[in-house]
A protein has these predicted regions:
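Catalytic alpha/large subunits of respiratory electron-transfer oxidoreductases
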Residues: 1-160, 198, 241, 285, ...
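Long, low-complexity segments enriched in small/aliphatic residues
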Residues: 47-55, 210-305
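Short, solvent-exposed helix-loop connector elements
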Residues: 2-11, 175-181, 203-206
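Long, contiguous, secondary-structure-rich segments that constitute the structural scaffold
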Residues: 181-236, 242, 296, 300-316, ...
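Generic structural signal for well-ordered, non-membrane alpha-helical segments
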Residues: 12-16, 20, 67, 86, ...
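Generic recognition of flexible, low-complexity loop/linker segments
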Residues: 26, 34, 91-99, 122-124, ...
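Short beta-alpha connecting loops at secondary-structure transitions
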Residues: 153-155, 159, 169-181, 302
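Flexible loop/turn segments at secondary-structure boundaries
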Residues: 8-11, 44-49, 114-118, 142-145, ...
Length: 398
């Protein structure tokens, strides 16, 4: 089973993933080649970022923050006083957006453009403007930079050394091809300089390899993945706990990671989306992507060819709906939701069902002006893929 973000960006996203796990175990399709549940992550190295502890509730290698023994171990390895690490964990970015101004006074946004990519763009902009201080670090100017007090220039994959980890847990070496332009620096260098300015100890790294070795020291599942081993063409899959361990290309061959070695089935009940079409907002808007653009177009819109293919956003509307509303193909129309409005071009098609609209998420003042901030109760993922909207013909919309 291979899935992507579409089934997770709903208030039932966790249930959807659990359903696939149930199906995989029920049919015996797990623990061997060519089977299992395999997520295609939203972009390169999402797996690697999560492995490093980018979640608010885990340290590197998915070591849980709330476990006292793990906190004690991390404090000892990092040379911290006993009890220094908190026994609670933080919130997700979607939750943090709601907390801007109170209690969050300052925010450091790194390689992200939430003004376009997060639901209810109007709300995101209002909340960011409540901050006393906002730093944005990115490789190009974005819509989020417009709200920043300081913008720091990072660099792209081709301008830095390090590792990327694929969805199959394969750790790949990344090697710098060219130097960063101008004042841009590798991300780790910016963090080291910032730590120095703040007077923080333990950040005096000189290279990505030093950082990686420090990570291996505190992360049992990656302890055996030295740079010397990663230089080899076949690379390594974690878990790889020792230098002589071959890595683990396939998980759950003999047993599951649970204490009893057994898999867990989840009993699930159907739950509708948080927001469904009604008399006031009679259309269901589904969001997704286009092949010509990537995420918020921070990179792809700088390509003349890709910009030429799709210079601005559009919404697909069923032929019968367009006929009933007297909307012509290529006409600009108004979409409204309970959160905002957007003015895309209409693309009349039979590729969507009556009562359903489809709109890509790449563009500012587009789909995420409309989408819902309702969260999955477990993952805290917002319901980006589904909301209720109305459609209005604009006089002179041509």
């Amino acid at each position: 089973i291979i899935y992507c973000l579409g089934i997770t960006e709903l208030t039932t996203g966790t249930d959807n993933v659990r359903s696939m796990g149930n199906l995989s175990m029920l049919t015996g399709n797990i623990g061997r080649e060519g089977v299992g549940v395999n997520p295609l992550r939203g972009q390169n190295n999402v797996q690697g970022a999560c492995d490093m502890g980018a979640y608010p509730n885990v340290y590197s290698g998915y070591q849980k923050c709330e476990v006292p023994e793990i906190r004690k171990k991390m404090e000892e390895l990092w040379g911290m006083e006993a009890g220094s690490l908190p026994d609670w964990y933080g919130s997700t970015l979607t939750e943090q957006i709601n907390e801007c101004g109170d209690p969050i006074k300052a925010m450091y946004i790194f390689a992200l453009n939430p003004v376009v990519s997060y639901p209810d763009s109007n709300h995101v902009m209002r909340q960011l403007d409540k901050l006393d201080f906002l730093v944005v670090q990115d490789i190009f100017w974005t819509e989020t930079c417009e709200h920043a007090d300081v913008v720091l220039p990072g660099c792209s994959f081709a301008e830095k050394d390090g590792t990327f980890t694929s969805g199959e847990r394969r750790i790949n070496r990344v090697r710098k091809a060219v130097d960063p332009p101008g004042d841009a620096k590798e991300d780790w260098e910016i963090f080291v300089l910032l730590a120095e300015k703040l007077g923080l100890k333990g950040f005096d790294f000189k290279s990505p390899e030093e950082i990686w070795d420090d990570l291996r020291r505190v992360t049992p599942s990656m302890a055996g993945c030295s740079y010397a081993r990663l230089e080899k063409p076949e690379s390594l899959h974690w878990p790889c706990p020792t230098e002589d361990h071959p890595g683990t290309p396939i998980l759950h061959r003999e047993k599951f990671a649970a204490a009893d070695g057994l898999g867990t089935f989840f009993g699930l009940e159907y739950r509708p989306p948080a927001e469904v079409a009604d008399a006031e907002y009679p259309f269901t808007l589904m969001t997704g992507r286009l092949i010509f653009h990537y995420h918020t177009r921070t990179q792809t819109d700088r390509s003349k060819i890709l910009h030429y293919e799709v210079p601005e956003g559009y919404v697909q509307i069923n032929t019968e709906d367009a006929k009933r509303l007297k909307i012509a193909d290529g006409e600009r129309i108004k979409l409204r939701s309970r959160r905002g409005e957007s003015l895309p071009l209409a693309r009349v098609t039979d590729d969507v069902a009556p009562g359903v609209l489809y709109m890509a998420m790449h563009f500012p003042n587009g789909a995420n002006m409309l989408t819902n901030t309702a969260l999955d109760p477990l993952s805290k993922m917002p319901e980006l893929k589904h909301c209720a909207v109305s459609v209005e013909k604009i006089e002179g919309g041509n």
